[in-house]
Amino acid sequence: MPATAGRVRMPANNRVHSSAALQTHGIWQSAIGYDPYAPTSKEEPKTTQQKTEDPENSYASFQGLLALARITGSNNDEARGSCKKCGRVGHLTFQCRNFLSTKEDKEKDPGAIEAAVLSGLEKIRRGVGKGEVEEVSSEEEEESESSDSDVDSEMERIIAERFGKKKGGSSVKKTSSVRKKKKRVSDESDSDSDSGDRKRRRRSMKKRSSHKRRSLSESEDEEEGRSKRRKERRGRKRDEDDSDESEDEDDRRVKRKSRKEKRRRRSRRNHSDDSDSESSEDDRRQKRRNKVAASSDSEANVSGDDVSRVGRGSSKRSEKKSRKRHHRKERE
């Protein structure tokens, strides 16, 4: 079983969808009133017509239809987006190289236009076996290699020649001379317009290049100025930072010196205080010792005098007192 079984359905009409742009039936019918899908009479055999027609003759009839459509024109005056010089679509106005325009065709006599239309229709209806149609087909094959504008001009010339043969060669000569004059004028105008356009383009290019150079030079100057300002700011910041660092180091050194001096002063004071306290203690000790010695001497003298009076008890007491005093001195 395929992977898409039961999901994809075939369309009812298995044909490629054609857009409305390809359906030109309405365009032909509104432009020249020609209906290619109109029903034909049952009396005329279709098979004989199809066998007699050749591809070259069908192409010639198609070109004739195009020429008729351009000569008669549609209800609208100008096609949408058409060239302003020649009135055709497919190029812009400054790109136009067509020597003939639809405006020139409108300036023709209405009788000549009607005669050209009738002759073209007769050529299409009569058939294909004539030599004139073969000449037209050969000329149109050569013209198919060139642009569409050349094809249109040649078809108009052929129609005008046929119409002129019927009514006279004077009208053909007049129309040909008028067309030549118009071609020359159009060529001169085209050359002038081309030269003017080229000069304008050169001027605009020069202006743009000069403007670009100026803008580039200005931008370079601005960048240089900005870089200089940045360098100056950086140098100032560095100088300020160096000065701040030097000031901080000086302050630190001063603080260190002051701390050292304070410590020295404190140590000196403590040393002096210690020495003073030690000397005072030594003096006190000496005074005590002197007092004790003096008291012991006085007691010894008193005890020697009173030996006779006092018995063994007094001597013992004096010994105890002397021992106590010695103990006190040793403790101190």
UniProtKB/Swiss-Prot annotation:
Keywords: Metal-binding, Nucleus, Zinc, Zinc-finger. It is found in: Nucleus. PROSITE patterns: ZF_CCHC. A zinc finger (CCHC-type) spans 81-98. Transmembrane segments: none annotated. Residues 198-214, 227-236, 254-269, 314-332 have a biased composition (Basic residues). It holds the Pfam family zf-CCHC_3. GO terms for molecular function: nucleic acid binding; zinc ion binding. Residues 134-153, 241-250 have a biased composition (Acidic residues). Residues 41-54, 124-133, 154-163 have a biased composition (Basic and acidic residues). Induction: Slightly induced by Ca(2+). Expressed in leaves, stems and roots, and at lower levels in flowers. One of its GO terms (cellular component) is cytoplasm. InterPro entries: Znf_CCHC. Residues 33-59, 124-332 are annotated as: Disordered. It comes from the Eukaryota. May regulate CAX1 cation transporter. Interacts with CAX1. This is CAX-interacting protein 4. The gene is CXIP4.
